[in-house]
Swiss-Prot record:
Disease linked to the protein: Congenital disorder of glycosylation 2I: A multisystem disorder caused by a defect in glycoprotein biosynthesis and characterized by under-glycosylated serum glycoproteins. Congenital disorders of glycosylation result in a wide variety of clinical features, such as defects in the nervous system development, psychomotor retardation, dysmorphic features, hypotonia, coagulation disorders, and immunodeficiency. The broad spectrum of features reflects the critical role of N-glycoproteins during embryonic development, differentiation, and maintenance of cell functions.
InterPro entries in alphabetical order: Cog5 (IPR019465), COG5_helical (IPR048485), COG5_N (IPR049176)
Modified residues annotated as Phosphoserine in this record: S197
GO cellular component: cytosol; Golgi apparatus; Golgi membrane; Golgi transport complex; membrane; nucleoplasm; trans-Golgi network membrane
Any single Pfam family the record assigns to this protein: COG5_C
Keyword Acetylation: no
Region (Disordered) residue spans: 1-33
GO biological process: glycosylation; Golgi organization; inter-Golgi cisterna vesicle-mediated transport; intra-Golgi vesicle-mediated transport; protein transport; retrograde transport, vesicle recycling within Golgi
Quaternary structure annotation from Swiss-Prot or TrEMBL: Component of the conserved oligomeric Golgi complex which is composed of eight different subunits and is required for normal Golgi morphology and localization.
Domain of life: Eukaryota
Taxon lineage: Eukaryota, Metazoa, Chordata, Craniata, Vertebrata
Subcellular location: Cytoplasm, Cytosol; Golgi apparatus membrane
Originating species: Homo sapiens
Name of the protein: Conserved oligomeric Golgi complex subunit 5
Stated role: Required for normal Golgi function.
Length: 860
């Protein structure tokens, strides 16, 4: 086995080349140079190569030998497995056979590569010579290095020693300089402290330099300055305390000089930011304690509880007897709390103003920049947010734990809101006047530089930041109580209405009941007047109240047929409608009076209520509209009966100057007088009635003139009677108007048309009232009465009745449509004359054509 192992080592492949099974099976041809022996060996290798290759393949394919080819082959593991798997004798025989085959193969390989192996052996001898030479030279190099080391070590050690000595000397010199400076500054500090507050900023500057000298070095154990260090520590504490007192005094008295001096001290000491933070945090903590104390129900009930000593577990809730005193005590505490918030806000705001104006005289750095340089917000924004959050949280906890406080906050919310508004106004006034106080007290003493800055107007109570509303942040703490108050306010407004409109009721509220509703509305608006937004919110509640009243009243209105009859006396439904309208009118007038009596009433709130009152007015109009329609229809029916009378008669020869009016006119006058006395006089809203009856009067006048222009034939006697009717028409519609002249264009047309009855056609066509006062269509229709029967009126040509023609005119209010209808009648007349081969037209025809052309051109 040893020989085999040696053969395997000798036949190893050269470095860098890995041998494979193919190399062993098919060895490279041997070098043919070197004599016959070599040739013989080569021939032997050639003859045995085929058998050797087959032998190797058999070994590789044999499962008994495959384990020996694995990279992780372990002898112990293989031996253990062989003992357990097969007979040991068979395994040994198998292994011996394999070893024998490998020996033969190795022998063949050595014989085949004899020359190569000899060359390798020669190369090993040459390599040993080279290695021996290298070893000699390495020894020489090591000796040279040792000689150089002996020359360098001693100077190096000296340099290290001198360097350490120099460093210690420098440290000693630095320490001595610090000690000397500390001694000098300590001596100067003693003099500055003796100067009192006038030298306090210089003392702070000296302390700041002393702190700088003490940084990064341990000065303990140095006897020469031990007393000075103790003095410096006491001096720093004294300066800090003195500066704090100066700052507190300056903030309390609003003295910018004192505040500026104190801030300069803290800036020199390097504690400006920490001091400001501590001061603001202290104010916030104090305010939170005051809020908690003001809302502490135990503190509020303490005076009343001290008289009667309660036993264990006795509740601190107020008794009915002391509720008034407790409520008064609570609101007194709230007023004191607002005063304290105002005082603290003034101090913090004053502090921020000084910080914004004060600059260090050496570096010229503004103090406010030192505070906000790390991206922090301005101190007053931080403080104000803390105040508003404290109010919100403390109010929430207090009202959750005490039903009395909850009722006080919700029931008397306007009073609480007034305190807030007063606080806000005081803070705004302070903001507007603080700059004047600065200018009045501004000096250059103690380096207090109170110069003007561009952002003087930047103030939290004079908001200029669109993303922050400080007033809203303050009032947000009251949001839950405002919602509860508005809900209760709406209930207070709705309750009296629901009470006076019981289910199944048929009558509107009485005057006393309506007065109660108005008083409730006035009371709610008066209480809400403390704040614009609250007034607007309550006004919306009032608008809802008016809408509820309107809905309840509408349910009482009678819409049956008897509600619009004008034949007999008032029916029950009409009486109820009149009562509802009167009730709505009283509500409308009373609410309008309440709104007008409010001082500084917001326009938006007024518009909200006015919009609701418009619904009341619309309901009143809807309630009387059926009656008005019936009255208008009856008047039209009476006027249209004028065509049943004869106006073709000539002038009477009796010589009586007085011509009686027509029967229809007497009937119309009687009807209008009866309507006013039987129906409209029961309405208490005269202006509302006249606003509606004036429209009926205008319609009546227009209908009268329309039908008067259609009368054919019209004799001289008929003209006199029709003129009398015109005069009586003014008297007939008089009850419907405050003054007949208020009818406007209808009244002017009535007055202008009457003289045309007696004028010649040429004068009628040239009347100045034509076009502006009296429409062309009315005048041309009137001229038809002066034409022969052959010239038919438009309604006669269409074979319409007077009623149908009047309806057509109502359906076609356009003057152009009416003129086109008239033109058709004139054209039909021309055709009839030509068809009978007439020689001339009626004298009035050219005048009518001229007027028609003038009217059409005026429309264009």
């Amino acid at each position: 086995m040893g020989w085999v192992g040696g053969r395997r080592r000798d036949s190893a492949s050269p470095p860098g080349r890995s041998r494979s099974a193919a190399d062993d099976i098919n060895p490279a041809p041997a070098n043919m140079e070197g004599g016959g022996g070599s040739v013989a060996v080569a021939g032997l290798g050639a003859r045995g190569s085929g058998a050797a290759a087959a032998t190797v393949r058999e070994l590789l394919q044999d499962g008994c030998y495959s384990d020996f080819l694995n990279e992780d082959f372990d002898v112990k593991t293989y031996t253990s497995q062989s003992i357990h798997q097969a007979v040991i004798a068979e395994q040994l025989a198998k292994l011996a056979q394999g070893i024998s085959q490998l020996d033969r193969e190795l022998h063949l390989q050595v014989v085949a590569r004899h020359e190569d192996l000899l060359a390798q052996a020669t190369g090993i001898e040459s390599l040993e010579g080279v290695l021996q030479m290298m070893q000699t030279r390495i020894g020489a190099l090591q000796g040279a290095v040792d000689r150089i080391k002996a020359k360098i070590v001693e100077p190096y050690n000296k340099i290290v020693a001198r360097t350490a000595q120099l460093a210690r000397l420098q440290v000693a010199c630095d320490l001595l300089r610090r000690i000397i400076r500390i001694l000098n500054l300590s001596k100067r500090l003693q003099g500055q402290l003796q100067g009192g507050s006038r030298e306090i900023t210089k003392a702070a500057q000296s302390l700041n330099e002393l702190d700088y000298l003490s940084q990064g070095i341990d000065l303990s154990g140095i006897e020469v300055i031990e007393n000075d260090l103790l003095f410096i520590a006491r001096a720093r504490l004294e300066v800090e305390n003195q500066a704090k007192r100066l700052l507190e005094q300056g903030l309390e008295t609003q003295n910018p000089t004192q505040v500026g001096t104190a801030l300069q001290v803290f800036y020199n000491l390097g504690t400006l930011k920490d001091t400001i933070t501590s001061v603001v945090d202290g104010y916030c903590a104090t305010l939170e304690e005051n809020i908690n104390s003001a809302l502490d129900i135990k503190v509020l009930t303490q005076p009343s509880q001290s008289a009667v000593r309660g036993g264990p577990g006795r509740s601190t809730m107020p008794t009915p007897g002391n509720t008034a005193a407790l409520r008064a005590s609570f609101w007194t505490n709230m007023e004191k709390l607002m005063d304290h918030i105002y005082a603290v806000c003034g101090q913090v705001q004053h502090l921020q103003k000084v910080l914004a104006k004060k600059r260090d005289p050496v570096s010229h750095i503004c103090f406010i920049e030192e505070i906000v340089k790390d991206g922090q917000p301005e101190i007053f924004y931080t403080f104000w947010n803390s105040v508003t959050q404290a109010l919100s949280s403390q109010f929430h906890m207090a009202t959750n734990s005490s039903m009395f406080l909850k009722q006080a906050f919700e029931g008397e919310y306007p009073k609480l809101l007034r305190l807030y508004n007063d606080l806000w106004k005081r803070l705004q006034q302070y903001s507007q006047h603080i700059q004047g106080n600065f200018n009045a007290s501004g000096t250059t003493d103690l380096y207090v530089d109170l110069q003007h800055m561009e952002d003087d107007a930047q103030d939290i109570f004079i908001p200029k930041k669109p993303d922050y509303d400080p007033e809203k942040a303050l009032k947000d703490s009251l949001q839950p109580y405002e919602a509860a108050y508005l809900s209760k306010s709406l209930s207070r407004l709705f309750d009296p209405i629901n009470l006076v409109f019981p289910p199944g009721g048929r009558n509107p509220p009485s005057s006393d009941e309506l007065d109660g509703i108005i008083k409730t509305i006035a009371s709610e608006l008066n209480v809400a007047a403390v704040d614009t937004n609250l007034t607007l919110a309550v006004s919306k509640n009032v608008a809802k109240t008016i809408q509820l009243y309107s809905v309840k009243s509408e349910q009482l209105l009678s819409t049956q047929g008897d509600a619009s009859q004008v034949i007999g006396p008032l029916t029950e439904g009409q009486r109820r409608n009149v009562a509802v309208v009167n009730s709505l009118y009283k509500l409308h007038q009373s609410v309008t009076k309440v709104v007008s009596s409010q001082s500084s009433f917001p326009l938006a709130a007024e518009q909200t209520i006015i919009s609701a009152l418009k619904a009341i007015h619309a309901l009143m109009e809807n309630a009387v509209q059926p009656l008005l329609t019936s009255v208008g229809d009856a008047i039209e029916a009476i006027i249209i009966t004028m065509h049943q009378e004869d106006f073709s008669g000539s002038l009477s020869s009796s010589g009586k100057p007085d011509v009686p009016c027509s029967l229809y006119m007497k009937e119309l006058q009687g009807f209008i007088a009866r309507v006013m006395s039987d129906y409209f006089k029961h309405f208490e809203c005269l202006d509302f009635v006249f606003d509606n009856t004036e429209a009926i009067a205008q319609r009546a006048v227009e209908l009268f003139i329309r039908h008067a222009s259609l009368i054919r034939p019209l004799g001289e006697g008929g003209k006199m009677r029709l003129a009398a009717d015109f005069a009586q028409m003014e008297l007939a519609v008089g009850p419907f108007c405050r003054r007949v002249s208020d009818l406007g264009k209808s009244y002017r047309m009535l007055r202008s048309f009457r003289p045309l009855l007696f004028q010649a056609s040429e004068h009628v066509a040239s009347s100045p009232a034509l076009g502006d006062v009296i429409p062309f269509s009315i005048i041309i229709q009137f001229l038809f009465t002066r034409a022969p029967a052959e010239l038919k009126s438009p309604f006669q040509r269409a074979e319409w009745s007077h009623t149908r023609f009047s309806q057509w005119l109502d359906d076609h209010p356009s003057e152009k449509d009416r003129l086109l209808l008239i033109r058709g009648a004139l054209e039909a007349y021309v055709q009839s004359v030509r068809s009978r081969e007439g020689k001339e037209f009626a004298p009035v025809y050219p005048i009518m054509v001229q007027l028609l052309q003038k009217a059409m051109s005026a429309l264009q």
